[in-house]
Amino acid sequence: MKHILFLLTSIALLLSACAPLTKSSNATPSPTPLPQPILDPGYAQDAPSTATPPTDPTPFDPAPVSSGLLPADETNTYWAVNPSSGSRLFVRVAYPRAWNGELVPALVLVPGGTGATEPRKAEALAAEGFLVIIFDPEGRGRSEGTEDYNGFIGQDGLAAVIEAATALPGLDANRYGLVSYSYGVTLATGALARHPDLPIDFYIDWEGPVDRTYTTTGCGANRAGGIQWQACSNESWWAEREALNFIAEVRVPYQRIQSQTDHVQPTNNHAIDIVNAAVAGGVPWVRLNEYPAGQTYDATNQPAMLPDSMDKQIDRTVATYARYIIETVVNQ
């Protein structure tokens, strides 16, 4: 009997020695994700906003720009985070064809209407020697969120893209411009006015509608284009979406590009309106096309605008004006 008990005990010891070890609970933890880029919530305090307020109202410094852009799924594509909505905004970057790693002038392009990124424009301006940043505004293209029609939330998103993009290799922060097309003027002027510390050196506006009358092409029942569904009597809605509300607060050189025949409007009065408002508001340098800077104009006796053929060369015109402003205004 003793021999049997001894044999059973020996077998039990052998089985326990061969059993797999229990996995330690002290395994190396997964790396902590990098913080999402956040901008100073104080940016949105200059005017009432429909944006969701930050959960922590305590003031804090902006996140380091090195964490500002998160890589997306293609080469030279990224995500920036809109601090007002938490939405990820899709960003694409185009470099000059012969870029060798040196610092080059940069442009952020704001699309017209309720459009998204336009890679063709980016490539055309990159061919002119610029590093070009394009993006899908809130709720458009590949970006998250809900369409904001260039209101405060959209403006905060543009500000986040501008700030975050300063981390891009090759971007010269001393030659960094903003370019808007058509209704993009609302997004651009709102971002510059409400975020006065943005690292933008100059602003170029192509034929932007400057208030609700132009944006709706007349505010009447038979509107020809623009935002058809929003009543012009909705003061709170339009207060966020009229460039004339913001232009006087812009503190960088401003260039207006205007063709003789506007791409939407029946007159060019809107160009006169915004240039005059910019000069009256003390914008540091204001120019209409190639006329002397600082001039104001009479809408009933307008100067000749650019020939309509220039619309087919708009990318080259933007590049020419950007180089002129950099060389004669920004770097002086």
Regions found by a protein language model. Give the residues of each.
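Short beta-strand/loop motif that positions the catalytic acidic residue
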Residues: 250, 256-259
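Short beta-strand element of the alpha/beta-hydrolase
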Residues: 102-112
